[in-house]
Amino acid sequence: MARYRCCRSQSRSRCCRPRRRCRRRRRRSCRARRRATRCCRRRYRLRCRRY
């Protein structure tokens, strides 16, 4: 699974792209995941979940 991070420039409800797993093959899926994810705080870490 790709790991997402929260961007400081963006709102907390949005997530950044995964670091090394967005390329030609999965651009559309990455964008779709990016739109349908939220950043949540759990156990003092920022993770993204689909909602």
Curated annotation (Swiss-Prot):
Primary localization: nucleus
Q: What are the TM regions of this chain, as residue ranges? A: none
A GO term from the CC aspect: nucleosome
What role is this protein assigned?
A: Protamines substitute for histones in the chromatin of sperm during the haploid phase of spermatogenesis. They compact sperm DNA into a highly condensed, stable and inactive complex.
- Note the InterPro entries from the entry: Protamine_P1 (IPR000221)
The organism of origin for this protein: Trachypithecus geei
Q: In which tissues is it expressed?
A: Testis.
Q: What's a single GO BP term from this record?
A: chromosome condensation
Keywords on record: Chromosome, Developmental protein, Differentiation, DNA condensation, DNA-binding, Nucleosome core, Nucleus, Spermatogenesis
* Stretch forming the signal peptide: none
Q: What is this protein called?
A: Sperm protamine P1
Top-level taxon in the UniProt lineage = Eukaryota
- Entry GO MF terms: DNA binding
Q: What does the similarity note say? A: Belongs to the protamine P1 family.
Localization per record = Nucleus; Chromosome
